[in-house]
């Protein structure tokens, strides 16, 4: 591995020499593959479908370049069967697709949610204000909203934290990224980002609304802490979530489970509707539990699928030693082909399909919120 490390470092040095006048970004594009490129080349990689972590701010955490040196994801015991069906079903029946449509219409009305743009900051402000309104009746000793600032860009991540009553140190996280991008000209062209990832954001907002209305307002508290994360700058190389989970790792937080919702609204074939369970670069035991939730609460089946390295924000969790899982709208080959363009619009999406993803979130936070036999 030491020879391989020297080879990678040599490649980084060569690339850096080739672009002497541009600020360079350090990208991890594989488990043992790192490159240093200018910002313009970073965008070209995205256009070619190359996924990566932008670890420029976190180079001290690179595994040099040995996967065995990365933090180990613990093996936890997740519930072998569901135990809160009545509570979950009571919440599911109140999913409001009209409210989801209204929120997604507003969220996609921003010209772009590109994390470096003023529009991206404005969309984060709207999202934070809407979340605050959803949760306004919950006391601060139960629920808090954190604006997680990032030094290099204006759009902030949002963390909604419901503090556990018994074991607040055990954390369950539901994630989605709030930013969008037009890969043709990110700083100039519109990026409505309805599916990527307005759909996942609104899916989680609706779950938060129902959790607030049907659970928290009735005086119930989870035993474990439940958090909703709305990440900035996923499209820039998982920048926002990498900041968040790197901070959590440094603080030695106990994240027991993280579920990512990214692209939840597109159905390519209504006669073959399903959700996709990502099985690569995720945590198998947690993924199996998510399958249990789907079988228990959804009206459509799941299919296993693969998404590749650094596919979405769950990768930032597993990279930092936390269990991560990812549910997407379908098998990867059948996902929305209009993303990252002006054509990723609300009219192409199914609110009913998004509602199925909301059911997953409700099942996870209610079932794991009360679980203790880790």
UniProtKB/Swiss-Prot annotation:
Single biological process term from Gene Ontology: proteolysis
Cofactor(s) essential for the protein: Zn(2+)
Keywords: Aminopeptidase, Hydrolase, Metal-binding, Protease, Signal, Zinc
GO molecular function: aminopeptidase activity; metal ion binding; metalloexopeptidase activity
Binding annotation for Zn(2+) 2: 196, 235, 340
Record text on cofactor binding: Binds 2 Zn(2+) ions per subunit.
Signal peptide positions on this chain: 1-18
GO cellular component: fungal-type vacuole
EC nos: 3.4.11.-
Gene3D superfamilies tied to this protein: Zn peptidases
Binding-site residues for Zn(2+) 1, renumbered to this chain: 177, 196, 262
Cross-referenced InterPro entries: M28_fam (IPR045175), Peptidase_M28 (IPR007484)
Family: Belongs to the peptidase M28 family. M28E subfamily.
Name listed for the protein in its UniProt record: Probable aminopeptidase YDR415C
Origin species: Saccharomyces cerevisiae (strain ATCC 204508 / S288c) (Baker's yeast)
Lineage: Eukaryota, Fungi, Dikarya, Ascomycota, Saccharomycotina
């Amino acid at each position: 591995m030491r020879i391989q490390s020297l080879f990678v470092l040599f490649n980084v040095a060569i690339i850096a020499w080739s672009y002497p006048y541009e600020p360079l970004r350090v990208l991890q594009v594989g488990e043992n593959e790192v490159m240093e490129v200018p910002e313009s080349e970073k965008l070209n990689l995205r256009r070619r479908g190359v996924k990566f972590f932008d670890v420029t701010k976190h180079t001290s955490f690179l595994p040099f370049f040995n996967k065995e040196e990365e933090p180990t994801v613990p093996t936890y015991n997740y519930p072998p069967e569901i135990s809160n069906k009545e509570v979950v079903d009571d919440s599911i029946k109140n999913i409001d697709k009209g409210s989801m449509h209204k929120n997604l219409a507003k969220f996609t009305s921003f010209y772009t949610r590109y994390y470096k743009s003023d529009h991206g900051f404005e969309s984060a402000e709207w999202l934070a204000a809407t979340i605050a309104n959803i949760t306004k009746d919950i006391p601060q000793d139960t629920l808090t909203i954190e604006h997680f600032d990032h030094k290099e860009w204006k759009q902030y991540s949002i963390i909604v934290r419901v503090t556990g009553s018994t074991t607040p140190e055990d954390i369950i996280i539901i994630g989605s990224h709030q930013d969008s991008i037009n890969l043709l000209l990110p700083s100039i062209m519109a990026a409505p980002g309805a599916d990527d990832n307005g759909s996942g954001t609104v899916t989680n907002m609706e779950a938060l609304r129902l959790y607030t209305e049907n659970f928290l307002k009735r005086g119930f508290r989870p035993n474990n802490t439940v958090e909703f994360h709305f990440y900035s700058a996923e499209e820039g190389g998982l920048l926002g979530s990498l900041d968040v989970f790197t901070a959590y790792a440094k603080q030695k937080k106990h994240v027991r489970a993280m579920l990512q919702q990214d692209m939840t609204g597109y159905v390519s074939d209504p006669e073959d509707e399903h959700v996709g369970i990502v099985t690569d670069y995720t945590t198998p035991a947690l993924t199996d539990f998510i399958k249990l939730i789907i079988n228990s609460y959804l009206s459509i089946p799941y299919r296993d699928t693969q998404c590749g390295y650094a596919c979405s924000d769950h990768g930032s969790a597993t990279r930092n030693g936390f269990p991560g899982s990812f549910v997407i709208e379908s098998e990867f080959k059948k996902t929305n082909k209009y993303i990252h363009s002006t054509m990723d619009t609300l009219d192409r999406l199914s609110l009913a399909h998004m509602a199925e993803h909301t059911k997953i979130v409700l099942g996870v936070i209610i079932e794991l919120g009360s679980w203790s036999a880790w």
